[in-house]
Structures are given as C-alpha cells and as structure tokens.
C-alpha cells in the first residue's frame, strides 16, 4: 500500500551500545503491527462471576482476577519487547516466543548477559519509540513535509 506515492513500512529504531573491548551491540526494534498472535496465545483473563439480585455479574474486584490482569499486562509488554527486537537476532537463553511463561524473563536475561540497568532501559525506550508516535516525531515530520511544500 502507498500513501501519496510513499510505500508504508514499519517504523524502525536503532540503538547502538558502544563497547571498547569488542564490537558495539546493535539493537533494532520494529513496530509490532498486530497483536493477534499475542491474543491467540494469551487471551484476556475473564473475571469470575458473582450472583446478585440482578443476576450473574463479573467480579472485577476479585483479587485472583486482578492478579491475572496484572500478569496479562506484564506478558503483553514482554511480547511487544520480544517481537519488536526480532530484527536484532537476539539468541535468548531462556526466552522463547512460543512459551509465554518465559516472556517476562527478557529483562533479567539482558541484565545477566552484561547490560547495565541504564542500557536495558535504553533498549526498552528503543522498543517504545518504535511502537509509538510522540508529539515531537509528528511535529518533526510535519515541519519537514511543510518545508518541502514551501520549496516547490
């Protein structure tokens, strides 16, 4: 698909972590264009029901349900991080995309591989930048577009 003769591609961000004693570490993050795979593997938890005078209603205040919702959110973020970083060709030791029980270990694994907390946070920022448009990026793109129009 094209918009105004421009082919649409996924957003990509690159993070280069310098290493003095070896090659620099390059992380490439791309936008996750669909969460269908995640939803198929990890459907949203359903609240247990309670019987009221008005009938059967979901009990969203149930402590067990709230824990499941929190875990679901953690897995969702982990999935986005892992899928976004696929172009980096990371050879995970414990994390596998096929096993959602391993997903939340991604940050622990980056740290145990030797990244500092700050570097791991930069990886997260890179992933978030690839998956979101902030106002600064939109303004920069708009200004560039308008400058091109003014020069015509």
Question: Residue spans of the language-model regions?
Answer:
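Extended acidic low-complexity intrinsically disordered regions
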Residues: 1-12
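Short acidic-hydrophobic surface loop/beta-edge motif
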Residues: 10-22
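Short, surface-exposed, charged amphipathic helix/loop patches that serve as local interaction elements
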Residues: 23-152
């Amino acid at each position: 698909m094209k918009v105004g003769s421009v082919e649409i591609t996924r957003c990509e961000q690159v993070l280069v972590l310098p290493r003095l004693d070896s090659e620099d570490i390059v992380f490439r993050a791309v936008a996750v264009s669909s969460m269908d795979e995640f939803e198929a593997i990890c459907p949203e938890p359903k609240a247990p029901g309670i019987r009221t005078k008005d009938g059967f209603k979901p009990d969203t205040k149930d402590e067990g349900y709230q824990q499941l919702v929190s875990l679901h959110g953690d897995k969702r973020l982990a999935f986005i991080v892992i899928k976004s970083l696929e172009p980096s060709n990371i050879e995970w030791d414990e994390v596998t995309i096929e096993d959602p029980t391993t997903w939340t270990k991604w940050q622990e694994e980056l740290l145990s591989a030797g990244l500092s907390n700050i570097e791991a946070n930069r990886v997260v920022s890179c992933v978030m930048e690839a998956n979101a448009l902030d106002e600064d990026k939109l303004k920069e793109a708009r200004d560039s577009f308008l400058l091109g129009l003014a020069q015509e």
